[in-house]
Amino acid sequence: MNIMKMMKQVQQMQAGLAAAQEKLASQTVTTEGAGGKLKVTATCDGNLTELVIDPSIIDPSDSEFLQELLLQTINAAIAKGKETAAAEMKKLTGGLDLPPGMGF
């Protein structure tokens, strides 16, 4: 394979990855907990953008319950975002399993 052609392909892939990163920074995923009474929205690059808590699940005498629900739902949103990001990157890299940190 011609080295110039290979370099051009690498540049195209880098441009595609940069565009995908921008897209993922604005693409959101939402998860729900507590039977829909807790909703967390996050970008696919891991930033939380919305947290909705139904007042009916707030019990001042049992704050640990709410803390646990929040952690579970936030972690689920982050995991869902990572899965979405990984699927998008896999499309761009043609299924190559690149190590973490390689351009993302």
Swiss-Prot record:
Pfam families: YbaB_DNA_bd
Domain of life according to the entry: Bacteria
Record carries keyword Lipid metabolism: no
Protein name: Nucleoid-associated protein Amuc_1227
Gene3D superfamilies from the UniProt entry: Nucleoid-associated protein YbaB-like domain (3.30.1310.10)
GO cellular component, as recorded: bacterial nucleoid; cytosol
Quaternary state and interactors: Homodimer.
One MF annotation (Gene Ontology) recorded for this entry: DNA binding
Keywords for the protein's UniProt record, in alphabetical order: Cytoplasm, DNA-binding
Protein's cellular compartments: Cytoplasm, Nucleoid
The keyword 4Fe-4S is assigned to this record: no
Function comment: Binds to DNA and alters its conformation. May be involved in regulation of gene expression, nucleoid organization and DNA protection.
Family membership: Belongs to the YbaB/EbfC family.
Organism of provenance: Akkermansia muciniphila (strain ATCC BAA-835 / DSM 22959 / JCM 33894 / BCRC 81048 / CCUG 64013 / CIP 107961 / Muc)
